[in-house]
């Protein structure tokens, strides 16, 4: 594990400060400095290259003993290219140049944003030359650590409000992709309910029905993945050294229906995947980290950007933001990442931004480069990693027995149904709520991609799987889950499971096919208990006081309740009036629970009304605890109150590393209990090397946490 920082992005900081600042960075213990190499700046003419500043940076960083993370930015093409090759520019869906481009954006103040359409031959050729020339120049540098081949996947699949470029090359690729997918135009016509004479007639229309919209989303993702493979191929050919890592990262927003990237498809050829983070809610941050870790598919992942100072609130005037990071938060966000298995955390940035709409934000130092309490906190973090390298170099997090299922096409449908019509996205709320609930009681949560589950089954280590939004089916998915349940897994389904078949057509009976066999229920009606009460969005499902749900009382829910007819042997668990809306079926050695209401969504809705804080006594937590017990799952460590924790293991030692997080704005006290200690063990605070006390069988330990702070505890000598 290591900590680094962004340092130079033209024009900040000024050259005369570099030697002083880089020495400062080395003295506080940071290991890696990020350098941006913007295309628009380093190639001012067709055969002109200006690398003097970058050369100097590499020299001074090497003198300071610092490694360099070099950021390639093909998203800012030089202005002479736009003037000479207008055919390479982005276009709207009518084929016209997008107004007011290229421009200087917040993150690319040198201009040239958003770059070129790399579906165009000339755009691709010019960008390849930029990458080859730049990479070849620095591949022999001893202190080159990694190339970031794509910053935050900008411009993603949307730029300036457009789904993708409307140039002839992109539209042609869209039509070729459809032909490869369908083979014959009549096959597409049958599915889309159209009457095209050929694939050449097919336009791109962003507001359309589910089936076409899913194809558009999957083409967008295919195109994004192809662009990533293209970039990686160019960079690796120019720098074949395997110790020079190729990395990339997504942007700092939370996952919602506007999050259009299927991260699992862009990580295949990277050495490390990462994410920025500019969220305040620790639980949202945790969800983004679990997302990033899971999408990395076992590869290293990084917290690639985290604010070192004042943040942004996405308002017009960023400098008015009141989101200034405390010293505690400066430690906590990287420690949150490390507690989710990250191998690196990179501050954005060492010096406050000096130019453009992102100024004067983000610095670990003040605007003059002087140290602050945040630089001291970053130094404490780096020093802890150095002092306890034997612990952190051997830290690992066992695969989680608890997972959420993610079906990208379901959330594409939700994007069309809700977000684009200004409605609350219920599937996203349900996913977020289940994640918040599980995280609050100490579970690590894996995210399983539905395509992986359909193709390869559920990993053996998963014992409890929740599908928060199963509105659309996928071939093989129900069969994979059914086999896993028969083998002893516990599965929780969402309302309207399989409401649409894999083609996007509504199923005549819900749930259909294998889903029906697995869950043992049939939808009889959709109920909307709050439809006539505009003052409330939450209703209650009464739980049947037997077995699994005995003593819990009721569960808050949102939006709708799915009434069921039950097959023989299926046990009712929850009701709304006379209608059964929640059931349990035993299948082989496992259990399948049909939840006909969005319980996770209500949990998330209520937590957001409490500034993100879950209620420790919420009935959903009681239900999840019982489901986990049936699945044979429990966290290694639990914490009381509003603290939540993540626990890792130290290879070959029997020691545990506990990351204890306080997401609240107040100082709190929590009691920690370790579930699997055979004897009493000492507990040490690794940040200050103090002995906190002893914990063991039947013996909990009281720990204090400052507001928004994290403590790192070593359990065991």
Regions found by a protein language model. Name each.
Residues 12-27, 127-133, 254-266, 326-334, ...:
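Short, acidic/polar
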Residues 19-27, 32-101, 132-135, 231-239, ...:
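Aromatic-lined substrate-binding rim segments of carbohydrate-active enzymes
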Residues 249, 255-433, 527-530, 534-535, ...:
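Hydrophobic targeting/anchoring helices
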Residues 3-14, 36-52, 108-128, 210-226, ...:
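The substrate-binding groove and active-site-proximal loops of carbohydrate-active enzymes
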Residues 326, 468-717:
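A conserved amphipathic helix/loop scaffold
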Residues 5, 25, 33, 61, ...:
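Conserved, mostly hydrophobic/aromatic
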